[in-house]
């Protein structure tokens, strides 16, 4: 388990690093369940960067700093963990549990029930959330040309 980490609200100087972290993680981790064409489009279109920047401008983006570098990010939007990522080079070190615990803490301070979604094909994320005590809320209805997602819920 990690020994030192800080979860803090992202500031303007963090934005580029957070966008690069997301692109690296999507590129390395999402191809197996989204396919090469979808991942390439999402990264090259700027959609990933736009998603993070849009939430950053609303004050929803938090970063996980460890060993003087940003190793993870989460987006909290209402009672929802909209996005959570650990940089590909820092996965399987316990940082995901640290970031998820802080996100839960922040949301449970305001909401009794919290939620998140993940792609139905993202078996690593599904296993992680279940191991952290999240319950499947069910499969969400997929929109055309959009991969199916699973909702997870947790109650305070």
Residue spans of the language-model regions?
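Conserved beta-strand-loop-alpha-helix junction that forms the acyl-donor binding cleft
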Residues: 116-126, 142-148
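Conserved GNAT acetyl-CoA-binding A-motif
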Residues: 107-118
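Conserved GNAT-fold acetyl-CoA-binding loop/helix
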Residues: 26-50
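A short, internal acetyl-CoA/4′-phosphopantetheine-binding micro-motif in the GNAT/acyltransferase core
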Residues: 81-92, 119
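Conserved active-site tyrosine of GNAT-family acetyltransferases
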Residues: 129, 134
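Conserved beta-hairpin
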Residues: 58-72
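Conserved acetyl-CoA pyrophosphate-binding loop and the N-cap/start of the following alpha-helix
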Residues: 90, 94-102
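Conserved N-terminal entry element of GNAT/NAT acetyltransferase domains
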Residues: 1-16, 154-156
